[in-house]
Amino acid sequence: MALRYLNKFSLLSLAVPTLAAPIGSSFGVPGTDALYDYVVVGAGNAGAPVAYRLAETGHTVALVEAGSLYEYGNGNLSQIPANSLFFIGKDPEWTNNLVDWNFVTSPQAEWNNASVHYASGKVLGGSTGRNLMTYHLPTKGSLDRWAEDVSDESWNFDNMLPYIMKSQRFTPPNNNLRFRNATPTYDPAVLGRRGRLDVTYPNYANGLASWLVRGFRDIGLAAIRGLNGGQLIGSAYTLSTIQPGNQHRASSKTAYLDPLIGRNLNLIIYQSTHAKRILFSNDTVATGVRVSSEGQEYTLSARNEVIVSAGAFKTPQLLMVSGIGPAANLERYGIPLVADRPGVGQNLQDHTLAGPSYRVNAITGSSNSIPEFITEAQRQYNSNPPRGVLTNTGVDILGWEKVPEQLRGNFSTETEDALASLPEDWPELEYLPVYGYFGDQNNYMVTPNDGFNYLTIAAAVVSPLSRGTVDIASNDTEVNPIIDPRWFAHPGDIQVAVAGFRRSRALMASPAMAGITLGGESYPGTDVQTDDEIVEWLREASNTVHHACCTAGMGPRDNPDSVVDTQGRVIGVSGLRIVDASIMPFLPPGHPISIIYGLAERIAESILADA
């Protein structure tokens, strides 16, 4: 899927017409103490929406972000959908530190002791400026379970749907630019039209998608009416976070920050600024944040609240260096205890994926190494309206299922019991057909370059039973935390992954797909057959789907493992909230950005109600 830089577009999204003030007026002065109504740490999936909602209602907001503009740091490798796989592989040496935190996990025992690069956006927009732009809702049953687990019905599916829709600005697909047999079906009643975040279907659907619809049907995954009404089991085209006009990435930056920059000076952004620690008065009242810009430390104080939205890794780190977390962890680094919350940094959950690759008789991202192909792709993208392969991330149709009965024979009783505890509509596997070659996922740009086009059927474990941790390596937040996802630590995840691999093969052997493959399986190849051989391959070739969450979990106040209550307020202190993926009680099936946007809208309303 390697695509070249298209430099013409690298700064287009920075154009801000009809300004009320110079753009620079929206950015803070490094080294100068300042007072605001609210200080928000992290300008990502949740932090940017919260800052927007507070600022638009007249409150002053300091938004602290360690990164800067992804348009500068990554250019079109961030903006153009087809480039979104750059720099997100497992190889720690293949990253872009201008836009990435360069997180590397501790050695993963079940992945051959590999230390894995965990791509994470260090930019305005956070990982919404780096991800694959896949957008859909979780299942109804999973959010109903969320409400049950936290003892608050306001978090169930029916009550959260309006907040998710509040964030959405859905544009129907331009079916005149898509193949006639690639028309998505969807329910307009569950898609918002007046929100900030652009969601749509890309102007190009790969020709393989229509074959995949039939292939999914052949193996028992019926086509369903979109992925946004609380149902996932089946198959459907997925929405993407794409701006419909220019077909650029839509992120929390484009949705919630760009509209305010140079227009609403209630929001002041401190970019390239690290949050060092949360400050407290009277021991437990949060009053501000000590920050650092280019080595200059200063204080941003909050009249009302401090809101941490730094993500599943940096949020627990910031809490711990500020004195909130497991007492024993803090004692190791001489950090004074503010609140003993043993759940901080615990319960890390994530999705993993891997899949076989095939040569196919169709155009895929493998053709991007052909100069003539790229030239034509650029011409189409530069047209009005933009069209062609560059408008598509390379993943546009998804499939979901519980593992079929015939593949559950090797599941242990422990695995069956754990999976049986999930809601009935919760799929155990997600299938992501990727129009290119995955290989061992160390570097997605490494392909055979043999003149053939490839298709990979990646299977993701979306019912993870393994649990990991995040810990501090120092009392300094500029030293990355210790991240231990413990992927495959629970044998059930390996058992489900084996089943997913076999089902990926079954899809490609289906009557619908058999006619488009050229030869047999290219990777890992037909020598990998037994469960033991598949497991050995999975340990080498699996990667994260980058859905880390749950490290500062929401729950009842009387539960000692709860870190926040159902309004995002940190238990044991006052004036401090968390609003990001870390407070999710568990990881729902699928891609979580929709629920994180909804979570941000929901808690922003709570903050304003308490103002």
From Swiss-Prot:
* Residues that carry a glycan: 76, 113, 282, 410, 475
The residues responsible for catalysis, as annotated, are 547 (proton acceptor), 547 (proton donor), 591 (proton acceptor)
Kindly list the cofactors needed: FAD
Q: Which domain of life is it from?
A: Eukaryota
Q: Which residues are involved in binding FAD?
A: 45-46, 65-66, 123, 131-134, 581, 592-593
Its Enzyme Commission number(s) read 1.1.-.-
Ribonucleoprotein: is it a keyword of this entry? no
Pathway annotation from the record:
Phytotoxin biosynthesis
**Entry-linked InterPro entries:** FAD/NAD-bd_sf, GMC_OxRdtase, GMC_OxRdtase_N, GMC_OxRtase_C
Q: Which GO terms describe its biological process?
A: cichorine biosynthetic process; secondary metabolite biosynthetic process
One GO MF term on file is: oxidoreductase activity, acting on CH-OH group of donors
Q: What happens when the gene is disrupted?
A: Abolishes the production of cichorine and accumulates nidulol.
Free-text biotechnology note from the record:
Cichorine and its derivatives are promising in the course of developing novel herbicides.
Keyword set, alphabetical order: FAD, Flavoprotein, Glycoprotein, Oxidoreductase, Signal
Q: Where is the signal peptide?
A: 1-20
Regarding protein family, the annotation reads:
Belongs to the GMC oxidoreductase family.
Stated role: Oxidoreductase; part of the gene cluster that mediates the biosynthesis of cichorine, a phytotoxin active against knapweed, corn, and soybeans. The first step in the pathway is performed by the non-reducing polyketide synthase pkbA that condenses one acetyl-CoA starter unit with 3 malonyl-CoA units. PkbA also catalyzes one methylation step to produce 3-methylorsellinate. The nonribosomal peptide synthase-like protein cicB, the cytochrome P450 monooxygenase cicH and the O-methyltransferase cicE are involved in the conversion of 3-methylorsellinate into nidulol.
- What is the recorded name of this protein? Oxidoreductase cicC
